[in-house]
């Protein structure tokens, strides 16, 4: 008999939920405040009240064994000796509109818990109590119904019989999919060099899974240079492992949309090579990008009265799923949009609902790692999931950003102005919070006066200490570090967080009472900003610091996650195994440390391309340190000219900053006007990015030199194969700009392991260097030249970070030697 694991809430909501998507402001964060209220009510219930009781049972229906699991909010025995199952719900519905039958799902959930508990405890009957907590009035409204064990059993059996056709569909598909994947063949005639090795590593990691002596399943770091075919080398073995019963679902997580497209293309290749392949996939895209009915400002308007795709969504979604799940499907962005129009359902929510029925889910990192937007339907508990994390070198910075939060004082000032004249509870709360942040701004200026000069990472500005006999305007804790109008504290001051928390309730009231006000959108944005900072305060621990920065009249408060390791570790622990891969994951000790995978296996594969196809040169007589940049401009221009004059073609020059890029470009364009150039501008959208890259045509009649920024949109994730790019120059070692935040990061890791400069500057910088250099040579037939410009490339601290296929680097003493070496390379 087939077995289906089914969370109780999922069973109830799938069958009984009706109506529309409605994302209007409801006055509270359901997940966070709801949990707080649950704990508050559970604690107030007394000693005999059992909170969060885990219940599990196996039940048969229609020839299927269902394993049901869930947590009852509370179980207790009342004064009459009757057992009561308590189901707690927080709501913004006005008290007078809260009725006994306003949501059938609520009763159903309590009744299923009651059926399980009554059977396990041999209870002839029990009570189910709905406890509604009205968040605006703090009013508690309760409804109680008595059920016999027979009534509860019959109700549960009815639900399972209704769900059985869907379960049978899942069972039949799982069998078909597993058999199909077991017979899956590699879609190419042969493996590329290194491809079989990478595939083998990932296959073994997926098979080992939870049996490994490693927290949360097996972890693997794989550095795979350009050309190995990382996407197929990861997907194919993971799918083969699934075909052997190792993993229920595969999540392919990326940092960029271009990488998602690569995963979609790889799956299409598998389907083309094996048309009978039974495999479903879905690509999850941000709501703003897939919305079919945005408002006048281009934002999703997820209200039933405004959007036909939101109106009645839950009444139509099962019909849509029935039709879409009849066969194999790859639901990318275009396919979801087409299906959404066909069935008149929201494409974003359709993608989420389809993900439960798909074998491969492709999406951004945030769907797993972000504490706010992660896929709760999967990752609120662990499962037999396989995680493939592409471009994993991007994950440390992305993770830090996900767990951090930022708040600006100006948002309070602007909110007060938007409210106009007159007194109100909201204005009073805004004024108090604004005043608290104003005092903090004064304290920042006193603790860390601004310095106008910038320095190098190797020679940072000195800490600015509080002058003697000076009393700060606000009593802040002893700072960890203070510089350039920025103060870092070990703990967030309650003098700032308390008034911000106090803003929430009156702000909620105002938003609910004034849905059509002109200032509603602005104050809603403020509400979410306050919510973000209070959420971050909930998870704040020793891996965070508080950053206060004064800029003019602005005060910026950040709860800054310096070390995301425990949070990334906890996210990965939700799955069976995780393979994190990139062309640049060196040194592995750094990535294992900052991503919480200390026990992970790490492998580095050799480049599949012949070393002689890459001309690799360095001019170590140029310093691009910040203090030397102005003096280096002409030398850099001359070196770039020698690089591109050696052979007609397309080239890129990558710089550590826009300012330095513009300095060199101005000089280069003036002194070498015969060479065509393109300059990367900041904040390019997708269309402008595509237009820029379209200039890099195959076999050009004239040379083109693009000026770009390391770590930017052209410095990685760009595939210009063949003659579309035959060379690049890397100007500098890519160190992040020296600023108080980077210095705090350095100090943190100095205290943790003594490698602060490496963790904050050198390793991230060299990662950008290697990514940029990897734009050259994309296929075995490509030939190209890479020029490194900086004396630090000749230092052992940097040489030890070079990949194995850079062993043949040549250090040259002048532009004349460079020209001769390039001529020799291209003539071979």
Protein language model annotation of sequence segments:
Residues 57-154:
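Mg2+/Mn2+-dependent nuclease catalytic core
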Residues 336-361, 371-378, 506-623, 631-633, ...:
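A contiguous, basic/glycine-rich beta-loop/short-helix subdomain that forms a polymer-engagement track
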Residues 178, 185, 246-361, 369, ...:
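A substrate-engagement module of RecA-like helicase motors
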Residues 234, 261, 341-360, 365-502, ...:
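Signature of the SF2 helicase/ATPase Hel1-core->accessory helical subdomain module
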Residues 173-223:
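Conserved pre-motif I regulatory segment
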Residues 620-631, 682-793:
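Conserved RecA-like P-loop NTPase helicase motor core
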Residues 1-78, 82, 108:
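Metal-dependent nuclease catalytic cores that hydrolyze phosphodiester bonds in DNA/RNA
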Residues 656-681:
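Conserved helicase motor "Helicase C" RecA-like lobe of SF1/SF2 P-loop NTPases
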């Amino acid at each position: 008999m087939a077995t289906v694991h089914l969370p109780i809430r999922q069973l109830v909501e799938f069958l009984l939920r009706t109506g529309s998507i409605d994302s209007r402001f409801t006055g509270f964060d359901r997940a966070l405040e709801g949990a707080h209220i649950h704990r508050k009510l559970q604690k107030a219930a007394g000693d005999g009240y059992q909170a969060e009781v885990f219940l599990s049972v196996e039940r048969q229906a229609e020839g299927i064994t269902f394993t049901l699991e869930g947590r009852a909010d509370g179980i207790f025995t009342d004064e009459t000796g009757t057992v009561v199952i308590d189901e707690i719900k927080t709501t913004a519905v006005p008290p007078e509109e809260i009725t006994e039958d306003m949501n059938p799902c609520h009763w159903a959930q309590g009744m299923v818990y009651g059926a399980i508990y009554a059977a396990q405890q041999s209870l002839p009957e029990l009570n189910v109590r709905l406890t509604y907590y009205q968040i605006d009035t703090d009013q508690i409204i309760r409804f109680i119904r008595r059920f016999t064990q027979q009534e509860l059993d019959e109700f549960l059996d009815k639900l399972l019989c209704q769900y059985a056709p869907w379960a049978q569909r899942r069972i039949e598909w799982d069998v078909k999919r597993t058999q199909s994947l077991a017979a899956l063949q590699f879609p190419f005639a042969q493996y590329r060099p290194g491809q079989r090795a990478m595939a083998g590593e990932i296959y073994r990691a997926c098979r080992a899974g939870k049996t490994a002596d490693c927290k949360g399943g097996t972890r693997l770091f794989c550095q795979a240079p350009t050309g190995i075919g990382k996407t197929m080398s990861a997907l194919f073995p993971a799918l083969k492992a699934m075909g052997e019963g190792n993993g229920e679902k595969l999540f392919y997580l990326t940092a960029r949309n271009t990488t998602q497209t690569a995963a979609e293309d790889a799956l299409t290749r598998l389907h083309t090579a094996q048309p009978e392949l039974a495999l479903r996939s879905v690509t999850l895209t941000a709501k703003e990008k897939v919305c079919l009915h945005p408002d006048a400002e281009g934002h999703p308007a997820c209200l039933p009265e405004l959007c036909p795709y939101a109106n009645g969504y839950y009444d139509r979604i099962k019909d849509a799923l029935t039709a879409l799940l009849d066969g194999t499907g790859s639901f990318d962005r275009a396919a979801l949009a087409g299906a959404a129009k066909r069935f008149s359902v929201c494409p974003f929510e359709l993608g989420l609902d389809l993900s439960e029925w798909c074998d491969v889910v492709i999406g951004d990192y945030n769907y797993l790692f972000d504490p706010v937007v992660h896929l709760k339907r999967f990752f609120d508990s662990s499962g037999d999931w396989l995680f493939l994390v592409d471009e994993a070198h991007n994950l440390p910075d992305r993770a830090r950003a996900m767990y951090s939060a930022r708040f600006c004082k100006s948002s309070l000032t602007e909110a007060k102005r938007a409210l106009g004249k007159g007194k109100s509870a909201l204005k009073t709360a805004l004024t108090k919070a604004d005043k608290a942040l104003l005092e903090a701004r004064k304290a920042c200026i006193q603790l860390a006066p601004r310095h106008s000069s910038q320095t190098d990472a190797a020679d940072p500005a000195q800490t600015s200490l509080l002058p003697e006999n000076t009393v700060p305007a606000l009593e802040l804790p002893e700072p960890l570090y203070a510089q350039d109008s920025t103060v870092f504290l070990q703990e967030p001051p309650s003098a700032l967080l308390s008034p911000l928390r106090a803003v929430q309730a009156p702000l909620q009231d105002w938003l609910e009472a004034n849905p059509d006000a002109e200032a509603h959108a602005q104050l809603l944005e403020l509400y979410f900003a306050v919510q973000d900072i209070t959420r971050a305060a909930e998870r704040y621990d020793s891996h965070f610091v508080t950053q206060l920065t004064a800029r003019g009249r602005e005060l910026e408060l950040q709860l800054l996650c310096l070390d995301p390791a425990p949070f990334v570790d906890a996210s990965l622990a939700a799955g069976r195994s995780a393979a994190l891969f990139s062309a640049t994951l060196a040194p592995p000790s750094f990535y294992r440390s900052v991503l919480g995978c200390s026990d992970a296996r790490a492998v580095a594969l050799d480049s599949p391309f012949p070393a002689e196809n890459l001309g690799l040169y360095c001019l170590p007589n140029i310093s691009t340190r910040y203090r030397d940049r102005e003096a280096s401009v002409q030398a850099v221009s001359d070196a770039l000219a020698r690089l591109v004059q050696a052979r007609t073609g397309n080239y890129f020059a990558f710089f550590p900053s826009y300012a330095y890029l513009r300095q060199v470009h101005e000089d280069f364009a003036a002194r070498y006007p015969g060479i065509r150039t393109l300059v990367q501008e900041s904040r390019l959208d997708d269309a402008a990015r595509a237009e820029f890259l379209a200039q890099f045509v195959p076999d050009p009649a004239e040379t083109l030199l693009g000026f770009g920024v390391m770590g930017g949109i052209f410095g990685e994730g760009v595939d210009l194969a063949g003659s579309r790019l035959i060379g690049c120059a890397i100007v500098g070692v890519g160190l992040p700009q020296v600023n108080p935040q980077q210095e705090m990061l350095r100090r943190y890791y100095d205290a943790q392991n003594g490698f602060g400069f490496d963790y904050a500057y050198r390793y991230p910088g060299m990662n950008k260097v290697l990514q940029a250099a990897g734009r050259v040579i994309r296929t075995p037939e490509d030939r190209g030249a890479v020029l490194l410009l900086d004396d630090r490339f000749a230092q052992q601290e940097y040489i030890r970070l070079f990949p194995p296929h850079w062993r043949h680097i040549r250090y040259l003493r002048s532009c004349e030697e460079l020209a001769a070496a390039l001529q020799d390379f291209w003539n071979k």
